[in-house]
Swiss-Prot record:
Protein name as catalogued: HTH-type transcriptional regulator CzcR
DNA-binding region: 18-37
Lineage: Bacteria, Bacillati, Bacillota, Bacilli, Bacillales
Organism: Bacillus cereus (strain ZK / E33L)
Family: Belongs to the LysR transcriptional regulatory family.
Keyword DNA-binding: yes
All residue ranges annotated as the HTH lysR-type domain in the record: 1-58
PROSITE patterns: HTH_LYSR
Length: 288
């Protein structure tokens, strides 16, 4: 078993097909297929189900992937320990929820100060970003928090007001039972706050409509499709233009914190250290 066998296995698992993995790794397909077969023979167990749509992990394959991800992460960190220069460089993979209002300022400042770092930004929901940080797929992420996890180191970044957004100027709480709720998929911090509020009020929403893009939600509210709950900064432009109206909600549910997270046991590269410094320059940031 060689290191490149593990890299091939990881790529096939991530891509879901031999052809996509071969393209990603710049290998010929027959080589990828042979390496996977050789790995299965060596471990005496099938690691993938083969089907028309590609390949998916077996139960043993999923178990294998946990170890492979850890091994390859350790190899990357070993390289970083010896190759990490005083000048920040390399790739920094950062995840973020859509509504971190000062993120463009942070990224712009960081790029100007450290142009040798390639920033890779990925948007997502809080729960999936946490999972990707834990799986070493991201170096860190801005999420709705705070959270409690023994492997997570988190930094308090900011707190924002949450506003109920409607098309009409007036709003009554009973409208939750007659008007669709427009929300992100499960795993969104704003949705969790809204659902907790409705549960405490004993209200059952008429319909929940799920979206993946913030602008789609807000534009749909402006057209009268439904109502939503988002940070005030995210809806300021539409509210100022008179296209939607914002309503305060009870204080218990009316704010949400943004935190930056990373794995506690991950090697602190100069690139990450500099990124945290940049955040600190734009926010009052404390490690929780």
């Amino acid at each position: 078993m060689e290191l490149r066998d593990l890299q091939i296995f990881q790529s096939v698992a991530d891509q879901g097909s031999v052809s996509s993995a071969a393209k990603e790794l710049n290998y010929v397909q027959s080589n990828v297929t042979a390496r996977i077969k050789q790995l299965e023979n060596e471990l005496k167990t099938p690691l993938f189900y083969r089907h028309k749509r590609g390949m998916t992990l077996t139960a043993e394959g999923r178990k294998m992937l946990v170890y492979v991800n850890k091994i390859l992460q350790d190899v990357d960190e070993l390289k970083q320990v010896f190759l990490d220069s005083e000048t920040p460089s390399g790739i920094l993979k950062i995840g973020t929820v859509e509504t971190v209002s000062t993120l463009p300022t942070i990224l712009s400042s960081y790029y100007k100060s450290y142009p040798n770092v390639d920033l890779s930004l990925q948007a997502g929901l809080t729960e999936e970003l946490i999972r990707e940080v834990l799986d070493h797929q991201l170096d860190g992420a801005f999420i709705s928090g705070p959270i409690k996890h023994p492997l997570i180191e988190q930094y308090d970044v900011s707190t924002e007001k949450l506003m109920l957004v409607t098309q009409n100027k007036a709003f009554h709480i009973e409208e939750f039972t007659t008007t669709p709720l427009l929300v992100f998929n499960q795993g969104c911090g704003y949705r969790s706050k809204l659902e907790r509020w409705l549960k405490d009020e004993g209200l059952l929403p008429k319909r929940i409509m799920e979206f993946n893009i913030l602008e789609t939600i807000l534009n749909s509210v402006a057209l009268g499709l439904g109502i939503t709950l988002v940070p005030q900064s995210a809806v300021h432009h539409l509210s100022k233009a008179g296209k939607v109206h914002c309503h305060a909600i009870p204080e218990k549910y009316g704010s949400i914190s943004t935190v930056f997270i990373r794995r506690k046991d991950s090697y602190m590269t100069n690139s990450m250290r500099s990124f945290l410094k940049t955040i600190e320059e734009h926010h009052h940031i404390n490690m929780l």
